[in-house]
Design a protein with these regions (language model features):
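Transmembrane helix-bundle core of multi-pass membrane transporters
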Residues: 119, 127, 141, 145-219, ...
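Inter-helical junctions in multi-pass inner-membrane proteins, predominant
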Residues: 2-13, 19, 199, 216-221, ...
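Short, non-helical or kinked segments that cap or interrupt transmembrane helices
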Residues: 27-49, 62, 86-100, 148-153, ...
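Helix-loop-helix "hairpin" substructures at the membrane interface of multi-pass membrane proteins
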Residues: 194-272, 295-300
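Pore- or pathway-lining transmembrane helices of multi-pass membrane proteins that form conduits
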Residues: 42-47, 94-104, 127-128, 146-170, ...
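Single transmembrane alpha-helix segments in multi-pass membrane proteins
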Residues: 6-57, 75-85, 137-153, 289-295
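Cytosolic-side transmembrane-helix boundaries in multi-pass membrane proteins
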Residues: 5, 71-109, 172, 234-238, ...
Length: 346
């Protein structure tokens, strides 16, 4: 391997690592706030890329009807809860509007806009809106009533949600794969390296999102409420913070980050209905570096996963997935040795 080849592999690895970093941050966020090991994170990646692909073809994506169906079911559950708690009609109406209005509006706009074949950025915004709104609804229907259950129970629910979303993905998108057009098709030469415009977009989007998350958590009331819920759910509840609202918000952010990741990698690789699982698992491996608690460690782990995957594909392409996922073993052993005595004392 010469220096130019190593540089190309390193650039490719860092590019993939930037995407895995977004998924790792989403995984850490969801686990910190809700204690859910969110296996279906990768499905949001596939849904984002494939929803955009169908919009590119001028078709209404099936995720729109999934959004409407989940919103309707959530509204029925809200009505049942309101009746059981004896809420006034005005309170019930406000709750129904919060649940139904935005999904219905996004669905209507998408149904109208899909045949029009608007520019790529408009279609991308629609795809982001559709998939992002799925996140809070998934939490409301699958996890909210089990918020105080054990981590194992929540993990089992995550496995079920993963299989459900994967099966629905096959129904909505079919078995064929799609590759989306790049957001920027420019080319830049930096010595022996050829830098594509899409790579620049990936770095810029990942950096902007990380900075945005930092500002959100440090400067906004909702962000501080999420941090408080992550530190101590009971204490946050005693201070008047709604843990269910925090859970919905964390799932919404995770869905947004997953959908954005799908839009970013859609032009660089062919995405199938089940591609999100492996992509999400690589984000999970990166999150393990931070013990599902540290955002900086998860981001660094994502870069390591991306670089290792890139060099593995060069030296042993048939075993690159095995090599990447084997990385989790020494990390788990290290964390076990580091914290084992503390766990025994507890």
């Amino acid at each position: 391997m010469d220096l130019s080849t190593a540089g190309i592999l390193l650039l490719d690895g860092v590019t993939n690592g930037a995407v895995y970093g977004l998924l790792a941050l989403a995984t850490v966020l969801v686990f910190a706030v809700t204690r859910v090991i969110f296996i279906p994170q990768g499905e949001f990646v596939a849904y984002g890329a494939l929803t955009l692909a169908l919009l590119q073809l001028g078709r209404v994506p099936g995720t729109v009807w999934l959004l409407v169906a989940l919103a309707a079911i959530a509204a029925m559950l809200d009505v049942a809860d309101a009746v059981r708690r004896g809420l006034r009609p005005a309170q019930l109406l406000r709750g129904l509007l919060r649940t139904l209005l935005l999904p219905a509006l996004v669905a209507a706009v998408t149904a109208w806009a899909a045949p029009q074949k608007f520019p790529l950025l408009v279609q991308s915004a629609l795809a982001l809106a559709i998939v992002t709104l799925l996140g809070p609804l998934v939490y409301r229907l699958a996890y909210q009533r089990l918020a105080d259950a054990s981590v194992l129970v929540l993990l089992i629910v995550s496995v079920g949600v993963h299989f459900a979303l994967t099966g629905l993905g096959l129904v909505f998108f079919g078995a064929e794969g799609f590759r989306n057009p790049p957001f920027w098709d420019a080319r830049f030469v930096a010595g022996p390296l050829m830098l594509s415009g899409q790579t620049v977009i990936i770095f810029a989007a990942a950096t902007a999102l990380i900075v945005g998350l930092y500002v959100f958590f440090e400067r906004t009331l909702r962000g501080k409420a999420l941090r408080a819920t992550a530190v101590n759910r009971l204490g946050a509840r005693l201070m008047g913070i709604s843990t269910s609202s925090a859970g919905k918000l964390s799932f919404g952010l995770a869905a947004f980050m997953g959908a954005l990741s799908g839009l970013l990698i859609g032009p660089t690789t062919t995405i199938f209905y089940d591609s999100g699982f492996l992509i999400g698992l690589k984000g999970f491996v990166a999150a393990i570096f931070g013990g599902l608690a540290s955002y900086p460690a998860a981001a660094l782990g994502a870069l390591l996963v991306g670089v290792l995957e890139s060099f593995s594909s060069y030296y042993a392409s048939a075993f690159k997935e095995v090599i990447v996922f084997t990385l989790i073993i020494p990390v788990l052993l290290w964390r076990s040795f580091q914290h084992g005595h503390d766990d025994e004392e507890e």
